[in-house]
């Protein structure tokens, strides 16, 4: 773990770069008040930042080393432990011009603070016990949330809903360990069989709880990162029109000329609370245009990566050579086949298409001209994400790979523990497996995680958070 010293005072700009109404500079550390006092001067000359009352807003001016006024600003001191990092924190709110915010940052650096690493404020909150590791990761999930459902899930994690489940399971595991170790330490009481029976019942219960949590991973991941959705079809089948319809804006150029979309477009859409990362691919066909060829190759690769495939076929015409290429590409896959242009006379032999296209596909008819079938498509997407097993963004979700892997490993140790009990092996061997499960669950909250993993997690944060 990177170690810059526990008494370091750090500073960073906490608002996005560029122009805005307000810019926020955040300072954290034992000497944050001293650093801020050297550049923030309030109207009362005998009042300095280190003497501010905690959580009170004070008006003043930013001055440089020569006494020149840089800007008018507000300053808020939040003294330890009642702050985000549980350290002394000072936030300066200036006008949001890029130059003035950068100048205030430079003054803080000149007066004893150092530049914060990415995520270092939240990392300090974790190290100081303000948040556990799962809650810390949810901070970035809140920042990146694209739908209300995503935000509710992230906010629930920040409040500790997910962590509480993990901690409860770890507590139950400790009870099992205590009973088993008691039977080891006090063999004269002849409680070995009772301890094993109790351990077996509790371990099965915990294992089932982990299995339930893992069943939410796909939904949680999608709410966090978005459902990668590839729109596939031949040129001029209506892919860009569908993209614009789902986005509810004209993002993609729509013409009657095949090959208008020569590269893939990526956009996010909110479909019933589900964030869709929609990829409008180039129409798949043979072409002499090198740029379009690259686009077609990318389209084919997106079919392999996508969480959901929307395959478009034009009902107003017979299957073409380009359609045949789409059919071959999609063999054995699953997704939704959209029969487009159903506002026109149907020429396509749909039964023939269903026979040719082998895979798990739901067939739906749509028209982007009159929006026929669009609501049904959106509901189908939502149903696929939630699978009818959970209420939308309610309860606890596993939403990242690190958490899922730790749960899977803990589950494996619990399975080994049950096998050890069934083989009637000594309690010492049972304790080894169940303690390993306890440690794996601790990696989720950060109680037993390696320092390198902590560094890697917080390096993904933005500077200033």
For each feature predicted by the language model, list its residue ranges.
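Noncatalytic alpha-helical scaffolds and linker/capping helices
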Residues: 274-277, 282-286, 291-294
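A glycine-rich (often HGG/GG-containing) alpha/beta subdomain
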Residues: 1-152, 156, 160, 336
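Loop/turn-to-beta-strand initiation segments
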Residues: 274-276, 307-308, 334-336
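Inter-motif core of Ras-like GTPase G domains
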Residues: 292-316
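Short glycine-/small-residue-rich Rossmann-like dinucleotide-binding loops
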Residues: 247, 282-283, 307, 314, ...
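Beta-strand-turn-beta hairpins that frame and shape the catalytic cleft
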Residues: 68, 271-276
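C-terminal-of-GTPase-core extension/linker across diverse P-loop GTPases
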Residues: 2-13, 17, 151-270, 287, ...
């Amino acid at each position: 773990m990177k170690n810059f010293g526990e008494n370091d005072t750090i500073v960073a700009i906490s608002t996005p770069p560029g122009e805005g109404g307000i810019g926020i500079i955040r300072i954290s550390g034992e000497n944050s008040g001293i650093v801020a006092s050297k550049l923030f001067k309030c109207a009362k000359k005998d009042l300095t930042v280190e003497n501010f009352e905690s959580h009170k807003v004070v008006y003043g001016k930013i001055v440089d080393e020569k006494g020149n006024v840089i800007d008018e600003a507000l300053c808020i001191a939040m003294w330890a432990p009642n702050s985000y990092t549980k350290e002394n924190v000072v936030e300066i709110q200036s006008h949001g011009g890029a130059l003035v915010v950068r100048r205030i940052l430079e003054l803080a650096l000149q007066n004893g603070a150092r530049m914060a690493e990415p995520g270092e404020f939240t990392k300090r909150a974790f190290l100081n016990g303000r948040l556990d590791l799962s809650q810390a990761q949810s901070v970035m999930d809140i920042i990146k949330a694209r739908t209300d459902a995503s935000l509710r899930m992230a906010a629930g994690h920040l409040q500790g809903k997910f962590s509480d489940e993990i901690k409860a399971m770890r507590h139950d595991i400790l009870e099992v360990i205590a009973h088993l170790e008691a039977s080891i330490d006090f063999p004269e009481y002849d409680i070995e069989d009772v301890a094993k029976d109790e351990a077996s019942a509790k371990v099965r219960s915990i294992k089932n709880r982990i299995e339930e949590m893992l069943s939410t991973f796909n939904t949680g991941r999608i709410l966090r990162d978005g459902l990668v959705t590839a729109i596939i079809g031949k040129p001029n089948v209506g892919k860009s029109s569908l993209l614009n319809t789902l986005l509810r804006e004209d993002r993609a150029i729509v013409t009657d000329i095949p090959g208008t979309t020569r590269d893939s477009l990526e956009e996010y859409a909110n479909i019933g609370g589900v964030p869709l990362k929609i990829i409008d691919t180039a129409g798949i066909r043979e072409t002499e245009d090198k740029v379009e060829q690259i686009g077609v190759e990318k389209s084919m690769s997106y079919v392999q990566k996508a969480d959901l495939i929307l395959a478009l076929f034009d009902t107003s015409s017979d299957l073409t050579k380009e359609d045949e290429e789409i059919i071959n590409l999609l063999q054995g896959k699953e997704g939704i086949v959209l029969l487009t242009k159903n506002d026109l006379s149907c020429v396509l032999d749909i039964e023939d298409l269903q026979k040719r296209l082998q895979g798990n596909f739901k067939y739906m008819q749509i028209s982007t001209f009159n929006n026929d079938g669009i609501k049904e498509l959106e509901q189908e997407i939502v149903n696929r994400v939630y699978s009818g097993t959970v209420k939308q963004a309610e309860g606890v979700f596993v939403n990242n790979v690190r958490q899922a892997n730790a749960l899977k490993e803990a589950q494996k140790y619990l399975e080994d523990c049950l096998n050890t009990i069934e083989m009637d092996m000594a309690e010492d061997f049972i304790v080894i497996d169940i303690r390993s499960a306890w440690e794996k669950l601790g990696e989720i909250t950060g109680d037993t995680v390696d320092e390198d993993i902590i560094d890697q997690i917080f390096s993904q944060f933005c500077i200033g958070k």
